[in-house]
């Protein structure tokens, strides 16, 4: 069962208007969507996105004229909304990462805790599986992926072990990969007992395969463009790589962060960063002790909120 993280907090952060138009960019199993719908009036509207065909299938169970589900990535949100004749929205929620159901379903291949085919695709209807990618990736590229997206100190040793194992037998299951990685980590160092040795490597491969950080980076500017004045951007992230992108973007748009000196930027980027388009609302929010006790996977969640300003104002540098 998928338990939505920061459920009430996210809905509160959207500051929902009864007649507003809202987007749940990651439907999952609809926990956030259902609460948003409960707070909308008869003329309100909610549009949900998800790359996962199983999530879209679950969305069909919502029989509500105010609700519409779109199978696709939130990276194409502007184009998708245009096709629905929606040019502006009053709020958008991005609940990033992989869902509990995806982790717990062995056939999806996301988790080292359940043996299954090494898949890891958010959209199981397209693209390479993790097994297919591992069969062709070079040791150098694999090391870079694990180091960059997993922040794994033993990236080089793990990449070498995976490539070596691949020459002996194709790596096609989650347990195969987990055992290879765990053996390396246990050999070269110690890891927090609460975290499985393969956690960072699985995260890295999943992020790379699904282009999660690239999609987030191209989505955030679209969100700002689509928001009406006083509309809210609410983002829940689950690891430092995501949160760093969200934090930096919001600070840039709020005029509280500057471009690094000597960084080459296009004129349009310089103009964008010189105008204040967002106001950051409050501090980052984390799940409380009770929520973490009931749902341990919520422990790493961080929610950030920003509001679209009436007009972009000049920021003095």
Swiss-Prot record:
Catalytic activity: cytidine(1402) in 16S rRNA + S-adenosyl-L-methionine = N(4)-methylcytidine(1402) in 16S rRNA + S-adenosyl-L-homocysteine + H(+)
SUPFAM superfamilies: Putative methyltransferase TM0872, insert domain, S-adenosyl-L-methionine-dependent methyltransferases
EC number(s) on file: 2.1.1.199
Keywords: Cytoplasm, Methyltransferase, rRNA processing, S-adenosyl-L-methionine, Transferase
Transferase as UniProt keyword: yes
GO molecular-function terms, A-Z: rRNA (cytosine-N4-)-methyltransferase activity
UniProt-listed GO biological process terms: rRNA base methylation
Residue runs in coiled coils: none
Any one annotated GO CC term: cytoplasm
PANTHER family: 12S RRNA N4-METHYLCYTIDINE METHYLTRANSFERASE, S-ADENOSYL-METHYLTRANSFERASE MRAW
Known function: Specifically methylates the N4 position of cytidine in position 1402 (C1402) of 16S rRNA.
Protein family per UniProt: Belongs to the methyltransferase superfamily. RsmH family.
NCBIfam families in the cross-refs: 16S rRNA (cytosine(1402)-N(4))-methyltransferase RsmH
Name the record gives this protein: Ribosomal RNA small subunit methyltransferase H
The organism of origin for this protein: Nitrosomonas europaea (strain ATCC 19718 / CIP 103999 / KCTC 2705 / NBRC 14298)
Annotated gene: rsmH
